[in-house]
Amino acid sequence: MADIACFVERYTVSRAEELTALVNFKLAAHELGHRLEYVFRKDIGKITDYDALFIRSLTDPLNAAYVAARTAELHGMKVIDDPDSIIICCDKINMYMHLMRARVPIPDTRFIGKSELDRQAMVQLFEE
């Protein structure tokens, strides 16, 4: 049996769909013989009391979910939405490069820089 922390931001529980998902995660954990507790931002210091961490909030290297994931990883815990994945997925160009290297089929993609953000360039882009 594992003690699992589920990191949740309060804003993520304001939608009925999210609440349903959180309840379903807890039920699934119990059915598999595990204990799942919800952990909020104020509880980040308690994350190391658990065996594993599951992130169920918006992830970005600049928010609390990343701090929670990094804390758990540094303490050798299993983490779903680990810090490296958060960084890769938040950086779309980095993610694109990983997909290309792995030969994952993806739609034609073009990156545009700040200097290309004018009306004429956008019209031309969509006419190609």
Q: What does each model-identified segment do?
A:
Residues 1-3, 48-49:
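A short, charged/proline- and glycine-enriched loop
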